């Protein structure tokens, strides 16, 4: 199956949630090609983090499935496909 690149921007409330975020992504069978963490995103609440992910996903991947999984484990402030 062909993998395609996908860019996601996820805003989370605290850095403690990063291990959970990455674990959940891995459990969904998604490969992370690159991750950038911005600890002072513009327009975000104090202490929030912006995590930009370059992912390799299957062609029929539905990002809303990942959002549902993440939201089950942690507060997701923003979830955006770039």
Regions found by a protein language model. Give the residues of each.
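Short amphipathic alpha-helices in soluble, non-transmembrane regions
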Residues: 20-28, 62-74
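Generic structural motif recognizing short loop/turn segments at the entrances and edges of beta-strands
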Residues: 4-6, 47, 75
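Conserved short beta-strand edge segments in small beta-sheet-based binding/regulatory domains
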Residues: 31-38, 67, 72-82
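Canonical alpha-helical transmembrane segment with a positive-inside/aromatic-interface signature
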Residues: 1-37, 41
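Helix N-cap motif at beta-to-alpha junctions
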Residues: 14-15, 56-61
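Short, hydrophobic beta-strand segments
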Residues: 8, 47-55
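Arginine residue identity/basic-tract feature
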Residues: 23-26, 31, 52, 59, ...
